[in-house]
């Protein structure tokens, strides 16, 4: 068998030499005189995979011991995580604890905790870092500990217009609908606003195809806290919202809010994350596709 050589083009930031780059790689494994660091991980409640990713990253990429507080939404997974990570728990580099916001606040402010990582909403992050809106506006954090976070947001789906075939249009509409339906819309990366070109001759047909594709999925349980409130807030602000599918007890129908006015920059759909099975659509005006 002939030996194969792999080649890659590596780009470095301006001012960073090859020597600098090599020196900074795997730094935690080169420095033998590091001070111990305790990382508090406030686990995600919506996607269990994120919990494992976070603690593994802290342990093996950042060389920090981990105190994981399970989210009350999926704390039933705690015993399974303890079983999977038992060797690390036995060595004393990982420990799981349980509780809600009160316990989380206590741990964030505990003097033994050096750094914090969380997965959640911007509201939770602000509560941890600033406490009140006044502190946030004045940029007065409650804690000087490093706090990293994976937060949600108003994620756009930017549709590039073109002379799509019927099959292409239907396939892309299915992709957008599935993206929302995944985990009932309770993902930080779920689509929240579909952005289209107003003069695209397939605009109306595409939006209709997304609606049809979403209707192929049954309504899902609104298992995440405050989902019903998010749903109600958006529907109260947009009477033209289209409810898709029948919802049983404890379920929420899928919702598409069409024709958002892009000039209304403070619209709830542009400013707030709809953490449920809901998204909106807005059409931008431009003379041509490059302008769009």
Predicted regions and their residues:
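Short, solvent-exposed amphipathic alpha-helical segments in soluble enzyme
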Residues: 55-58, 133-134, 211-212
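Conserved small-residue-rich beta-alpha loop and adjacent elements
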Residues: 1-88, 92, 155, 277
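Flexible loop/turn segments at secondary-structure boundaries
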Residues: 47-50, 74-78, 103-105, 124-126, ...
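ATP-dependent adenylate-forming carboxylate-activation enzymes
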Residues: 68-84, 97, 102, 163, ...
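Conserved NAD(P)+-binding/catalytic subdomain of aldehyde/semialdehyde dehydrogenases
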Residues: 38, 87-193, 198
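Structural alpha-helical scaffold elements that stabilize or flank donor/cofactor-binding regions
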Residues: 58, 106-109, 272
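NAD(P)-dependent aldehyde/semialdehyde dehydrogenase
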Residues: 182, 188, 198-292
């Amino acid at each position: 068998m002939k030996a194969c050589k792999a080649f890659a083009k590596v780009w470095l930031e301006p001012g960073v030499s090859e020597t600098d780059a090599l020196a900074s790689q795997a730094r935690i494994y080169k420095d033998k005189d590091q001070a111990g660091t305790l990382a508090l991980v406030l686990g995600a409640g919506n996607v269990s995979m994120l919990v494992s990713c976070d603690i593994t990253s802290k342990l093996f990429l950042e060389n920090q011991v981990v105190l994981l507080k399970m989210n009350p939404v999926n704390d039933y997974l705690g015993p399974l995580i303890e079983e999977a990570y038992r060797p690390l728990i036995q060595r004393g580099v990982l420990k799981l604890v349980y509780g809600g916001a009160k316990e989380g606040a206590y741990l964030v402010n505990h003097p033994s905790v050096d750094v914090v990582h969380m997965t959640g909403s911007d509201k939770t992050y602000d509560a941890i870092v600033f406490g009140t809106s006044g502190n946030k506006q004045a940029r007065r954090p409650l804690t000087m500990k490093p706090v990293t976070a994976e937060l949600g947001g108003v994620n756009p789906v930017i549709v590039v217009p073109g002379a799509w075939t019927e099959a292409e249009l239907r396939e892309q509409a299915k992709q957008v609908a599935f993206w929302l339906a995944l985990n009932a819309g309770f993902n930080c990366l779920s689509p929240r606003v579909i952005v289209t070109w107003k003069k695209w001759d397939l605009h109306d047909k595409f939006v209709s195809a997304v609606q049809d594709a979403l209707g192929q999925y049954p309504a899902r349980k609104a298992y995440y806290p405050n989902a019903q409130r998010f749903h109600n807030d958006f529907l109260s602000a947009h009477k033209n919202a289209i409810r898709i599918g029948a919802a049983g007890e404890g379920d929420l129908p899928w919702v598409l809010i069409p024709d958002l006015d892009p000039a209304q920059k403070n619209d709830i759909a542009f400013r707030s994350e709809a953490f449920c099975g809901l998204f909106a659509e807005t059409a931008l005006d431009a003379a041509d596709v490059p302008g769009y």
